[in-house]
Amino acid sequence: MNIFSKAIIDWYKENKRELPWRESSDPYLIWISEIILQQTRVAQGYDYFLRFIKRFPDVQSLADADEDEVMKFWQGLGYYSRARNLHAAAKSMNGVFPKTYPEVLALKGVGEYTAAAICSFAYGMPYAVVDGNVYRVLSRYFGVDTPIDSTEGKKLFAALADEMLDRKQPALYNQGIMDFGAVQCTPQSPDCLFCPLAESCSALSAGRVAQLPVKQHKTKTTNRYFNYIYVRAGAYTFINKRTADDIWKNLFELPLIETSVALSEEEFLALPEFRELVAEDRKSTRLNSSHIEESRMPSSA
């Protein structure tokens, strides 16, 4: 065991977060937790995890469920493609969770990080995890300024993570470095004063903690404007099921007209798409214009 790995494991034993999925070596439970945490903070995902596994305690119960029910139990977590991928993957397992890294990696919605986490936590296999926390810790400690989102950077950090991995205790080390990045070596205001790696941290000695890790590209944002139409007929409200192949696929929503710019009420009501929608709704529900109220919400994507 190298000095870095020992410090991480020792720190983890003293500071680890008590989380329900860490009390089990069941690959199914670990898989569910990792998929939830892909786009969700631990504090938010905690209760959702407990509720989800209570209803779907194993692979077979998830595989046998209707997709609509799976989506219902995922409601509130967002990024619903994760739930659809979970359901599809469970159906492909024939009731038994795979036991090798290639098989786990082949599951729908599972990438290299998730496969490494499952295989090391559940089976004790020596696969190093590399996520945002790991990038940050390794970049700062070793003073690596190669962009983490570059091809070169991804290869470099994957090799460095593998080199630092304690092959006798891969689960402890992987959990440790992720928690270390989440709690100790945080993106903003890391606790360098009480860091067990402070004396040998390259970024700290060079005064570059705030500059590392480096990203090559900034995320490009585009403004999208979602104009939702609230159509009412007596006790009924009109909704659509999305069919577009995006993160909201198969979810229900109010009728939507998307525009590239923000529109005034007059401009919106004059849209051909709006007039067409009103005409269709009149045919199907015998509505008049007093039944239609428009509600617009801008969105960034």
Task: Annotate each language-model stretch with its function.
Residues 186, 220, 259:
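A short glycine-/small-residue-rich loop at the edge of a beta-strand within enzyme catalytic domains
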